[in-house]
A protein has these predicted regions:
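A short secondary-structure junction motif
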Residues: 46-58
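A short alpha/beta connector and helix-capping loop motif
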Residues: 18-45
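Short hydrophobic beta-strand that contains or immediately precedes a catalytic carboxylate
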Residues: 6-8
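Short active-site-proximal "capping" loops at secondary-structure junctions
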Residues: 12, 43-48
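Active-site-adjacent betaalpha module
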Residues: 1-4, 13, 31-37, 57-160
């Protein structure tokens, strides 16, 4: 059985004063080869999305903004247009690679990390959130609140 490091949305448009230090830590974690497999997600936005139309969110529209901010080292990248990374492509990857544990890191704790962690947990995957390798571009206070919320929703032992 393999352990997967799933790096969520470490993209140029999510890098700011709140996330830049966490980005450095994530890069070091990816470079450590501590996990059997590493995969990345990339949020893709456009003018027809609900994010653009309903929230006036214009991030991750350009190729530069969508670009992953660290070297993916030719690991698998899953494109997504919603908060969660859980879709058929990811589930097939998990099954095909005999993955038993999934470790999440990346951005934003309050959105894509939370939604992905809950979705994996609800579908009975063994999921863990690496709290020191996640952050919200809205700041540490938001990050901490959602880490506490995730501990309540998926179990304190799954926040490491």
């Amino acid at each position: 059985m393999n352990r997967l490091l799933l790096v969520i949305d470490v993209q140029n448009d999510f890098i700011n004063e709140h996330t830049k230090n966490t980005l450095t830590k994530i890069k070091e974690l990816v470079d450590s080869n501590k996990y059997d497999l590493t995969a990345f997600t990339r949020f893709i936005n456009d003018e027809n999305s609900i994010w653009y139309k309903k929230l006036n969110y214009k991030g991750c529209i350009t190729k530069e903004g969508q670009s992953i901010a660290i070297d993916t080292k030719n690991n698998k990248v899953f494109d997504k247009t919603v908060y969660t990374a859980v879709n058929d492509a990811l589930k097939n990857y998990i099954r095909e690679n005999n993955i038993s544990e999934i470790y999440l890191c990346g951005f934003d704790t309050d959105a894509c990390i939370q939604k992905t962690a809950i979705d994996l947990f609800e579908q009975n995957y063994d999921v863990y959130v690496l709290k020191d390798y996640c952050m919200s571009h809205a700041g540490k206070e938001i990050h901490d609140f959602y880490i506490d919320n995730l501990a309540r929703l998926i179990g304190n032992d799954r926040i490491i």
